[in-house]
Amino acid sequence: MVFGTLYTFPGDQCRTIAIKAVAKANGLDLDIRETPRTPDHLSISKLGKVPAFQGADSFKLFECMAIALYITSQNEQTTLLGKDKKEYAEIIKWMSFFNTEIVILMTQQLLPQLGVIPYDRDQVEFFANMTQRSVDVVEEYLQDRTFLVGDQLSLADLFCAGNISLGFQFFYGKAWRQQNPNVSRWYEMVCHQPIYAAVTDKFQLLDEPKLTNNPPEKKPETVPKNGAAVAIEATQA
């Protein structure tokens, strides 16, 4: 029986990965709709943002964190929400941090280079530096830690790895990873977890960045569908 309908874009949409991963692990069958902004979708999210969710019982949710927490909580024995209230609060803390202080800034670095919004070299550089400031916080935090919260995998790891996958898809080549070994180690660890790998494309790392702060070569309408969709929607939920 279908548990609910999830509205998203095709491919590894950065704010949807954790939702898909936890749903699959919990045995919850989701009807994945990859053509957003249909009337049904807009009845849930008036702004047409993804992800959006409607349960088989007609319960509606938008905002990625809310959906991820709701899907995870369907398993009352889950270990993904922490061992106690403090760990639960930390999980939400890191989800919020990545969702606001990394993804939003990173997409302002990304969208101009994809030709989705006007390109300005100084603005791209500004947002790249702002993103790195936030990533530096995580890099320092992970110096002597394997997981973001506690001593086992949590929803924070799944959700935040999905968020920062944009960086590893477009920007984070070998040189960057050498300069940010803790974040890189953590990201690779999460990507190889069966729960995460089961719903994502084959894991690959860049040797060189795909984008290095240059004007887009293609017009917006010819930007690869998946890359543009991932980038645009990363700013919207």
Swiss-Prot record:
GO cellular component, one term: cytoplasm
Keywords: Transferase
Bilayer-spanning residue ranges: none
Pathway participation: Secondary metabolite biosynthesis
Domain called GST C-terminal: residue spans: 84-222
Domain spans labelled GST N-terminal: 2-79
Biased composition (Basic and acidic residues): 208-222
Enzyme class: transferase
Region (Disordered): 208-237
Binding site for substrate: 49, 108
Cofactor(s) recorded in Swiss-Prot or TrEMBL: glutathione
A Pfam entry, by short name: GST_C
Phenotype seen when the gene is deleted: Abolishes the production of pseurotin but leads to the accumulation of deepoxy-synerazol.
Binding site for glutathione: 37, 49-50, 63-64, 99
Enzyme Commission no: 2.5.1.-
Gene Ontology MF terms: transferase activity
Induction: Expression is induced under hypoxic conditions.
The protein's role, per its UniProt record: Glutathione S-transferase; part of the gene cluster that mediates the biosynthesis of pseurotin A, a competitive inhibitor of chitin synthase and an inducer of nerve-cell proliferation. The PKS-NRPS hybrid synthetase psoA is responsible for the biosynthesis of azaspirene, one of the first intermediates having the 1-oxa-7-azaspiro[4,4]-non-2-ene-4,6-dione core of pseurotin, via condensation of one acetyl-CoA, 4 malonyl-CoA, and a L-phenylalanine molecule.
Protein family per UniProt: Belongs to the GST superfamily.
Protein name per UniProt: Glutathione S-transferase psoE
Species whose genome carries this gene: Aspergillus fumigatus (strain ATCC MYA-4609 / CBS 101355 / FGSC A1100 / Af293)
Lineage, opening ranks: Eukaryota, Fungi, Dikarya, Ascomycota, Pezizomycotina
Gene name per UniProt: psoE
